[in-house]
């Protein structure tokens, strides 16, 4: 055999061995996932697997999860979870078009135990720390420890409750080192935290915590990693803090002291009472280029160690935009950091910011810190916020807050709105009748939202009644569009605003559409804001004498803002 033929034969033999090795390592989708993995194993691309208990990847073994794999936790009496132990690895590389999905057959918060990684990086919880789930050791002396790769993964419906004190998160990092690659992860619809770090040095990018009913992001026990492009979005009234940050509850000054460096965050609360960013228990932090909205207490500080670090510059909060104020809950002594410190000129911070975000999370504020000057891990993104318009890194692999793909869900609009409601861009809204915003309620319509009237036998229209408000602030780049499936004049009934300003038609005046009262004695009545809105194909004919306009203003007062329509 000549040399060329020998090489070809050797290559073919090696390929055959390689295929045999892979086939040996691939787990059959018919086999339930439970117990210990002690050798390298593969979950094959595009396959669906069933998790029926705790799955531990043991030291020396690697679990490879290929793109498009779905793992479904069984709704049974077992505690289902996946745990990567110290010295083991996970190689889970999904893609934007084929994410890895870990979910449950019971589509409810708290259905299963989530994904847990245990590493050998430093923590401040002692030498015998054990994971809250699986009783696995974590922590050590190797900040560069490598637990593998996590990319384009969605964990849904985590947060299994073990006791009143212990619930499993979506993603949990126990002493994970910065040799581990972590980006493009979403924790969706869980009953505990979306993401939690127990010490470690792991760096993270492109994280989304969506409607997790405890904290969106949580750290403790000395986490000292970096994070960039992180989104929290809360809908449920049960949701707690957007960020809950601790060093160590038992010893606030335990070392290493938690000191993550974070940039480009968009944190959107549920509009209820509660905290946005909660810094406490001695934690330090550097947070830059961040938007916080939807919480009555956007930033709170607690404990002397935490406030001292802010006051002396060890911790830094810069280029941060808060919808509400800064408050101290420090019960250990005098307040060491307050809103005046937060608003100092060199911090470039703002309180009272009104968010102009598309789909609740998309949008940025120009101007910010180039965090790449702090560490090469960071991209140069000198703006506040995580998701710039025109660069939707969530597209295709993540879910929206209502469970639709980021390509857009469909929601029907009809009847009465009696409480504040927000229409989000990216969601397909179909108007299938009269939509009345009732007294005391505000309808907020975000930039870029499209409302489409259905082509049917029902009269479709949108009406803001007396005492109600509309807050519809489109932009030149992202106007609000109200249109019809049937692209013809007279297809639907248009937009109608009823106010309490003077009219000369008497005290019993009613709108031509919707039979709503209008007129009064308040020339300064305020029905809200209308900016950059396009109404298309209005003018529905009720009779020979009555047709609906595009925009109709019934006794609207001059407290209302109207432009660019």
Give the role of each language-model region.
Residues 71-72, 449-452:
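Active/ligand-binding-proximal structured segments within catalytic/core domains
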């Amino acid at each position: 055999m000549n040399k060329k033929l020998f090489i070809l034969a050797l290559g073919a033999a090696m390929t055959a061995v390689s295929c045999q090795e892979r086939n040996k390592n691939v787990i059959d989708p018919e086999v339930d996932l439970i117990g210990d993995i002690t050798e390298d194993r593969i979950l094959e691309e595009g396959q669906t697997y069933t998790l029926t208990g705790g799955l531990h990847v043991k030291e020396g073994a690697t679990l490879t999860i290929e793109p498009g794999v779905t793992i479904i936790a069984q709704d049974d009496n077992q505690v289902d979870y996946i745990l990567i132990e110290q010295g083991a690895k996970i190689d889970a590389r999904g893609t934007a078009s084929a994410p890895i999905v870990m979910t449950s057959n019971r589509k409810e918060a708290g259905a299963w135990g989530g994904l847990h990684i245990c590493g050998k990086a430093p923590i401040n919880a002692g030498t015998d720390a054990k994971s809250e789930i699986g009783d696995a050791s974590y922590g050590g002396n190797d900040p560069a420890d490598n637990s593998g790769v996590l990319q384009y993964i969605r964990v849904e419906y985590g947060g299994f409750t073990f006791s009143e004190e212990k619930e499993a998160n979506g993603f949990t990092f126990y002493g994970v080192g910065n040799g581990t690659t972590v980006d493009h992860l979403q924790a969706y619809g869980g009953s505990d935290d979306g993401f939690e770090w127990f010490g470690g040095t792991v760096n993270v990018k492109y994280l989304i915590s969506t409607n997790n009913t405890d904290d969106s992001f949580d750290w403790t026990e000395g986490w000292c990693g970096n994070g960039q492009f992180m989104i929290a979005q809360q809908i449920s009234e049960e949701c707690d803090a957007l960020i809950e940050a601790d060093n160590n509850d038992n010893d606030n000054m335990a070392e290493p002291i938690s000191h993550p460096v974070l940039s480009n965050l968009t944190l959107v609360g549920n509009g209820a009472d509660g905290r946005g960013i909660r810094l406490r228990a001695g934690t330090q932090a550097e947070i830059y280029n961040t938007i916080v909205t939807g919480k009555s207490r956007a930033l709170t500080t607690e404990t002397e160690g935490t406030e001292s670090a802010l006051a002396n510059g060890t911790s830094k909060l810069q280029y941060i935009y808060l919808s509400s104020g800064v408050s101290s809950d420090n019960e250990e002594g005098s307040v060491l950091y307050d809103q005046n410190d937060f608003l100092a000129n060199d911090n470039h911070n703002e309180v009272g910011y009104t968010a102009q975000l598309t789909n609740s999370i998309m949008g940025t504020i120009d101007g910010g810190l180039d965090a790449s000057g702090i560490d090469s891990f960071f991209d140069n993104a000198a703006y506040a916020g995580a998701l710039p318009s025109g660069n939707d890194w969530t597209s295709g692999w993540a879910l929206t807050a209502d469970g639709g793909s980021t390509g857009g869900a469909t929601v029907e609009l009809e009847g009465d709105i009696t409480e504040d409601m927000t229409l989000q861009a990216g969601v397909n809204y179909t108007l299938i009748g009269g939509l009345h915003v009732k007294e005391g309620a505000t309808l907020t319509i975000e930039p870029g939202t499209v409302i489409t009237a259905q082509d049917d036998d029902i009269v479709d229209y949108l009406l803001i009644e007396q005492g109600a408000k509309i807050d519809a602030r489109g932009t030149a780049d992202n106007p609000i569009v109200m249109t019809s499936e049937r692209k013809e004049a007279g297809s639907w009934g248009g937009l109608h605003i009823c106010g309490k300003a003077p009219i000369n038609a008497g005290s019993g005046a009613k709108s031509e559409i919707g039979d709503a009262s209008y007129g009064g004695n308040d020339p300064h009545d305020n029905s809200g804001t209308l900016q950059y809105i396009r109404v298309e194909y209005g003018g529905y004919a009720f009779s020979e004498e009555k047709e609906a306009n595009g925009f109709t203003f019934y006794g609207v007062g001059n407290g209302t803002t109207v432009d660019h329509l």
